[in-house]
Amino acid sequence: ANVDAIKEKENAIFMDTGSPHHVQTVNDLSNFEVFKEGKKLRYGLYGASGSNINFVEQLENGFAVRTYERGVEDETLSCGTGATAVALAMHKTGKTALTKVPVKVEGGVLEISFEAAASGYKNIFLTGSAQQVFKGEIKI
């Protein structure tokens, strides 16, 4: 799907990439309090409906992101729509000129490719590995 509505907020970008995402750059991402700050923004800034909250740090080659995911109400190892929002937000704000952006998540590295369009972005693709991290059975 295309992403058309990108809103610049103070120190952040907001967009819907299939679900709502707040993208905010931070320093020292590895020590950042994602749960505490994510929960505060998810409810405080976006109310009951909320938003996923992505904290981003620029790397030498791409970006690193940690995401507080609504519904899960905690940090997750990877969020595809969040990584996509990060790549588009970093392009929109001029932090990268690349249209194939590597994004490091806690669960690995994803690559987001896209084309800039008059009102946003189109032909958006996410690639990355998939690994089984859990298997279980539930008796009904």
Label each residue range with its predicted role.
Residues A1-S78, A85-I140:
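Active-site proximal loop and beta-alpha junction motif in alpha/beta enzyme cores
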